[in-house]
């Protein structure tokens, strides 16, 4: 990881030409095929908004999940009727065809490929997931944009409609190998990207050295957690520590931003809640991890 890049002058990328264009320009700046953590770190650093930093972290997590993914933007499609439980899903994969609906797909507008969680068990069997890949624009694939949310409104969401769409089934169990670990991969890489965005703003705005040093330490911790197995109990414990460190900086961050350009403070006040979206789920994983490592 070229850490020296963190301390170089930053030219931020905006998304005036759309998210797909933004992501392509980011990859070009990073040499075309960056490692996932580098994509999250330097993508966050160069992002013009917290939402774009989120997008860099999200794409980085997807690349860890599916290392053979094309070098275009993608999305993971799981949620149906506000649930991610396999038993609540109706989307199915039969052979190489996928049919169903996903209700909340992040960054669908710029996604070239879509990873779709779909049930594949036989009649009378327990729900079992597979993960299939479909391409946006292919026959049977339709994206329905949803209204922008108050949080990171520059990153869109959509419903995905599939009608006998041609798909490639990825190897492994859809839940254990993909959906379950992605939660931790996303948390780690989004925290990295957003912290890098803050660090870049702080260097530009002349924040106190002590605050910048703590952000550096947080990023170094993210690098270590990114190397760990996402389903390991110790990983959940370490990741919880990183989020605790980030939350402990909240007052200092708000004060530093308030003392600088109003544009950065306004963006952060609007979007800082993105780091708390999955807070309840992380707390459950932390409690479970504590019991496992304690031998309960």
What is each of the regions a protein language model found here?
Residues 2-110:
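Glycine-rich flavin
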Residues 62, 132, 198:
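Residue-level signal for inorganic ion chemistry
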Residues 99-100, 138-149:
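Active-site glycine-rich loop that binds ribose-phosphate moieties when present
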Residues 99-137:
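DPxDG-like acidic metal-binding loop motif
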Residues 147-225:
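Glycine-rich beta->alpha junctions and the first turn(s) of the following alpha-helix
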Residues 205, 209, 222-233, 253-260:
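Secondary-structure edge/capping motif, primarily at the C-terminal ends of alpha-helices
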Residues 219, 239-250:
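Short amphipathic alpha-helical coiled-coil/interface segments
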Residues 258-296:
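Glycine-rich phosphate/cofactor-binding loops in nucleotide/flavin-utilizing enzymes
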């Amino acid at each position: 990881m070229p850490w020296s890049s963190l301390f170089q002058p930053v030219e931020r990328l905006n998304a005036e030409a759309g998210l797909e264009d933004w992501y392509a320009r980011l990859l070009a700046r990073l040499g075309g095929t960056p490692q996932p953590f580098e994509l999250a770190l330097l993508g966050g650093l160069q992002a013009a908004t917290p939402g774009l930093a989120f997008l860099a972290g999200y794409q980085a997590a997807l690349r860890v999940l599916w290392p053979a993914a094309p070098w275009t933007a993608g999305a993971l499609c799981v949620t149906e009727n506000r649930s991610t439980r396999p038993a609540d899903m109706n989307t199915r994969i039969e052979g190489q065809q996928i049919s169903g609906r996903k209700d909340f797909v992040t960054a669908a507008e710029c996604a070239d490929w879509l990873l779709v969680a779909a049930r594949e068990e036989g009649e009378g069997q327990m729900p079992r997931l597979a993960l299939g890949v479909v391409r946006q624009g292919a026959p049977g694939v339709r994206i329905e944009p949803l209204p922008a949310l108050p949080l990171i409104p520059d990153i869109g969401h959509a419903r995905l409609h599939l009608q006998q769409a041609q798909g490639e089934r990825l190897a492994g169990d859809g839940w254990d190998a993909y959906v379950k670990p992605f939660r931790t991969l996303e948390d780690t890489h989004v925290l990295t990207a957003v912290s890098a965005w803050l660090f870049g703003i702080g260097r530009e705005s002349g924040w106190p050295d002590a605050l910048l040093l703590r952000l550096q330490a947080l990023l170094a911790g993210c690098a270590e957690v990114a190397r760990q197995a996402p389903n390991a109990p110790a990983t959940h414990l370490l990741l919880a520590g990183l989020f605790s460190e980030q939350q402990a900086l909240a007052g200092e961050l708000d004060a530093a931003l308030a003392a600088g350009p109003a544009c950065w403070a306004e963006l952060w006040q609007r979007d800082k809640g993105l780091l708390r979206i999955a807070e309840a789920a992380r707390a459950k994983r932390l409690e479970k991890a504590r019991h496992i490592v304690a031998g309960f």
